[in-house]
Structures are given as C-alpha cells and as structure tokens.
Amino acid sequence: MATAKNKGKSIRVLGTSEAEKKDEMELEEEFQFSSGKYKDSGPGSDMWLGDASSTSPRSLRKTRTFDRHNPYLVSSYATPQPPTTTTCSVSFPFYLPPAIQNQQRFLHPNDPSGQRQQQMISFDPQQQVQPYVAQQQQQQQHLLQYWRDILKLSPSGRMMMMNMLRQESDLPLTRPPVQPFSATKLYRGVRQRHWGKWVAEIRKPRNRTRLWLGTFDTAEEAAMAYDREAFKLRGETARLNFPELFLNKQEPTPVHQKQCETGTTSEDSSRRGEDDSSTALAVGGVSEETGWAEAWFNAIPEEWGPGSPLWDDYHFPISNHKDDLDATQNSSSDTI
C-alpha cells in the first residue's frame, strides 16, 4: 500500500512539474509570437495558429499537427517546393522578415513589363499597325531633314518636298548614304568647303604660286572662274572645264578699229543726208509753186469760172496780141 501511495505521489509530482513546464513554454512562445517571432522547427513540430498581431482578443491555442502520422505528407515536405508568386501576406499568416520578402520579390517580380512585352509580341493587327505607322512617319521626317539640309529649301520648297514624300508610297525605310558632291562631279581647280561653299584657285605657270579666285555658291560658277583665269594665263593651250565656251570663237576686234569704222559710217551717213536734203529742197520749190496755183484755181467757185454764164453780160474789147505788136512797130517807124 505504501509503495502504491508513493508511486501515486511521484506521478502527481511529475504531472505538476510537466504542467508547469508546459505553462512556461506556452508563456515563452506567446512572448515570442507577440514580439514578431514565430516557431517553426519542422513539419512535425508544433505551430501557433491565430492572428499575427499581439493585440488579438482571441486566446491562442496550441494545436498538434497531424503531419507526423502521414508518411506521404512528410516525404512531400522533404522535397523542396518552388516559391509561389503571391505575396507573403496572402501565402503565409505569419510575419516574414524584410530580407525574405525582398528576395521573393526579386525572384518573382510583379511588374507590368512582362505584360507589355506580351502585348508587343501579340498578333493583334491594331498593335502591329501602330508601330509600323510611327516608324514610317519617323523615316519621312529623317528624309525631309536630310534633303532640307542638302538643298537648303525655302518654306515653299519644304512644303513641296513634304507633299512629294506623302504622295510616294514606296519610300525606303533606311536613310540613303550621304555622298559628297565631289564624288559625282569633279572640276579642275575647284574644291568644296565643309560648310557647303565652293572655292576656286589656280597656279600661275611661272612661279607656281596659287592665285585665289574666290568663293562661290555652286561648283559651276567656281569652274567658270577657273576657266576664265586659265584662258587669260595660258591661252588656247589651257586645260579648261568648259572648253566649248572659250575655244574656237572669233577673236574680238580692237577698239580703235571699231572707232574708225563708226567714224566712216557717220561721215557717209552725213553726206547722204545733205544730198537728200538738197534734192528735197529743189523738188520742194517746184512743188510749192504748182501747189499754190492749183490752190488758187480751186478757190474760185465753179459759177465764177471762165465758162460761167455770168460773164455774158459784160462786153470786153477783144484784141489780138499780134495786132498790138504791129501797131507799136508802125508807130515807132513813123517817129524815126
């Protein structure tokens, strides 16, 4: 009997000691949970279930997981599970340190870049047309800027170029390579500055020094200036850019010869003018007399003419000129 009582006392003491230990463990775990820590020693360990905040009104209950009794679940816990893409607040009811949260976000970012990339790769016709149209407009702007810089277009020329680019449907997608003007047309004694102007210069045949001819807007003007100076220095043996404009042409007549020719022509014209004036005066005198007589006769009215009946009432002595002459001669002879 005594031994049985002693055994019962020892069992009670052990039970009370175990209960005290359990209470201490519960207090310790509660303190850890309230301070932000959690206990997770493995799949077969004890877990706390409840709210993550220490101010939860519900009492925390300690439950024993039943995973240790299922060997299949234990083996599944042994295999590594891939991390989920959801956030920690949704996946776990426990507080995770910031380092683990940042690591999960870094491994599985939740940004819309992937969605944008999927939208760009998708075969939606609207999404394919928009980038193509934008690229075509950009190419047109590049071409317009290129030709405007080369041709130095005015505002009207710029509008014409824009209309031409709009009308053309088969525009090249790449900008044509820039070719210098010197590669297309070369002139002797002409070179181009890097800002677009053209200069001309020539070497003198005697001392081989360079003679500056000037700066020009076009290569043709500079080539003409070189040809003029080369023709002056070397004559017909000069190598010119435009030989058809200078060679095989009539030599210009001297100035004094032109003056002599003009003097002789002026003298001849003056002499001819004098002769014409004298003949005109002679003819003019006769013509004036006849014209005056005709005008006098024309001024007499028709009824006063010689055949008019008005003269019948007047009796004029009719005399002959011969009789008058004879009478005068007879009278003169009598007196003698």
Swiss-Prot record:
Its main location: nucleus. Residues 186-243 bind DNA. Keywords: Activator, DNA-binding, Ethylene signaling pathway, Nucleus, Stress response, Transcription, Transcription regulation, Ubl conjugation. Induction: Induced by drought stress. Induced by salt stress. Induced by abscisic acid (ABA) and heat stress. InterPro entries: AP2/ERF_dom (IPR001471), AP2/ERF_dom_sf (IPR036955), DNA-bd_dom_sf (IPR016177), ERF/AP2-like (IPR051758). GO terms for cellular component: cytoplasm; nucleus. SUPFAM superfamilies: DNA-binding domain. Residues 1-10 have a biased composition (Basic residues). The keyword Transcription applies. Ubiquitinated by RGLG2. Ubiquitination of ERF053 leads to its degradation by the proteasome. It is found in: Nucleus. It comes from the Eukaryota. Residues 1-60, 247-280 are annotated as: Disordered. The keyword Nucleus applies. GO terms for biological process: ethylene-activated signaling pathway; positive regulation of cellular response to heat; positive regulation of DNA-templated transcription; regulation of response to water deprivation; response to salt stress. Pfam families: AP2. GO terms for molecular function: DNA-binding transcription factor activity; sequence-specific DNA binding; transcription cis-regulatory region binding. SMART domains: AP2. Belongs to the AP2/ERF transcription factor family. ERF subfamily. Transcriptional activator involved in abiotic stress tolerance. Can directly regulate stress-related gene expression by binding to the DNA sequence 5'-[AG]CCGAC-3' (DRE element) of their promoter region. Involved in the regulation of stomatal closure movement under drought stress. Acts as a positive regulator of drought stress response. Interacts with RGLG1 and RGLG2. This is Ethylene-responsive transcription factor ERF053. It comes from Arabidopsis thaliana. The lineage of its organism: Eukaryota, Viridiplantae, Streptophyta, Embryophyta, Tracheophyta.
